[in-house]
From Swiss-Prot:
Substrates-to-products reaction catalysed: (E)-4-coumaroyl-CoA + 3 malonyl-CoA + 3 H(+) = 2',4,4',6'-tetrahydroxychalcone + 3 CO2 + 4 CoA
Enzyme Commission code(s) on record: 2.3.1.74
Keywords from the UniProt entry: Acyltransferase, Flavonoid biosynthesis, Transferase
Coiled-coil region(s): none
Organism of derivation: Callistephus chinensis (China aster)
Signal peptide: none
GO biological process annotation, one example: polyketide biosynthetic process
Family to which the UniProt record says this protein belongs: Belongs to the thiolase-like superfamily. Chalcone/stilbene synthases family.
Role summary: The primary product of this enzyme is 4,2',4',6'-tetrahydroxychalcone (also termed naringenin-chalcone or chalcone) which can under specific conditions spontaneously isomerize into naringenin.
An annotated Gene Ontology molecular function: naringenin-chalcone synthase activity
Active-site feature positions: C167
Database matches in InterPro entries: Chalcone/stilbene_synt_C (IPR012328), Chalcone/stilbene_synt_N (IPR001099), Chalcone/stilbene_synthase_AS (IPR018088), Polyketide_synthase_type-III (IPR011141), Thiolase-like (IPR016039)
UniProt name for this protein: Chalcone synthase
């Protein structure tokens, strides 16, 4: 029988010493680009709803206030004309939606993952774990299995499939990747979030304006990151360290954001006070996350917040007294891609590190050392990840 000392030594050898680190990032979108200024006319025309004049005006105002310039969508006008059930508000259409997402979600994820692996520069055989996250459909074997096949990963790669989590899940996947990387020596975790709105697209209804809000905000996109602890600086270039990660359900928030998979697809329900609920509770989450570091000035850290919509960002800024530039990367991604659910925060990390390098900032976090990543979504669930940036000049050692 092994002694306690032997077991302790084995356990110590299995774990890493340093924090989990983001080593590479890749993103991808469908080729079909939709400009927000044109979208109300297109949306009401393709759904044969132009007779709903007042509702169209409301939708135009939603789009105008969305702070979105463009989005990417797999669903083209041609496909929607061939599948008119997707354009109705409550027509049975799940089969047609599933036919799209079970194929296209892994494919879009592959595009993002391929870019991340290329930037990482290591053989894909070194990937030990795969986390795949999507709110777009469900299937068995899952999108994680399909991506393993598409990428040619080892059949022994340890897979985790997360379906139907929602917009907070960009934080969830990083929290899980952190635990995997830090507790498995030599682990290199491929994280992929891939979202396609084919499961939520539907025509307008004047009694359910919350559904219309989703039509004004959501876009398609996939993002991938490679996560590992104790990077090999001769071959890997670390971007951000993950110092802590937490999840909480906000008080008195049940029913604030719901999604239900039905014969008609994934229906979306939203209460008006979501921005208020988030802004009311965000400082408590920040204080709990940053008190071990002695940080209380929220303008002294960099910000990566899920852009659920402009009202959420506005109220968070107001509540915390944030300077306008704090949400620059977040608002840029919202403007150029819309709300891509779980993939958004990974797009924002990518935007921040690229802009930091372009601007000659000292670190990947806009020149600052510490930052926060927030994910918000159904529950209301909030994910809080504390990030430590690294020098933008950090090159692979030779």
């Amino acid at each position: 029988m092994a002694s306690t000392i032997d077991i302790a030594a084995i356990r110590e050898a299995q774990r890493r010493q340093g924090p989990a680190t983001i080593l590479a990032i890749g993103t991808a979108t469908p080729s079909n680009c939709v400009y927000q200024a044109d979208y109300p006319d297109y949306y009401f025309r393709i759904t044969k709803s132009e007779h709903m004049v007042d509702l169209k005006e409301k939708f135009k105002r939603m789009c105008d206030k969305s702070m979105i310039r463009k989005r990417y969508m797999h669903l083209t006008e041609e496909y929607l004309k061939e599948n008119p059930s997707l354009c109705e508000y409550m027509a049975p259409s799940l089969d047609a939606r599933q036919d799209v997402v079970v194929v296209e979600v892994p494919k879009l994820g592959k595009e993002a993952a391929t870019k991340a692996i290329k930037e990482w520069g290591q053989p894909k055989s070194k990937i030990t774990h795969l986390i795949f996250c999507t709110t777009s459909g469900v299937d068995m074997p899952g999108a994680d299995y399909q991506l393993t096949k598409l990428l040619g990963l080892r059949p022994s790669v340890k897979r985790f499939m997360m379906y139907q989590q929602g917009c907070f899940a960009g934080g969830t996947v990083l929290r899980l990747a952190k635990d995997l990387a830090e507790n498995n020596k030599g682990a290199r975790v491929l994280v992929v979030c891939s979202e396609i709105t084919a499961v939520t697209f539907r025509g307008p209804n004047d009694t359910h304006l919350d559904s219309l809000v989703g039509q004004a905000l959501f876009g398609d996109g996939a993002a991938a990151v490679i996560v590992g602890a104790d990077p090999d600086l001769t071959t890997e270039r670390p971007l951000f360290e993950m110092i802590s990660a937490a999840q909480t359900i906000l008080p008195d928030s049940e029913g604030a954001i719901d999604g239900h998979l039905r014969e008609v697809g994934l229906t979306f329900h939203l209460l008006k006070d979501v921005p208020g609920l988030i802004s009311k509770n965000i400082e408590k989450a920040l204080t709990q996350a940053f008190s071990p570091l002695g940080i209380t000035d929220w303008n002294s850290i960099f910000w990566i917040a899920h852009p659920g919509g402009p009202a959420i960002l506005d109220q968070v800024e107001l509540k915390l007294g944030l300077k306008e530039e704090k949400m620059r990367a977040t608002r840029h991604v919202l403007s150029e891609y819309g709300n891509m659910s779980s993939a958004c925060v990974l797009f924002i990390i990518d935007e921040m590190r690229k802009k930091s390098a372009e601007d000659g900032a000292a670190t990947t976090g806009e020149g600052l050392d510490w930052g926060v990543l927030f994910g918000f979504g159904p529950g209301l669930t909030v994910e809080t990840v504390v990030l430590h940036s690294l020098p933008t000049t950090m090159a692979i050692a030779t």
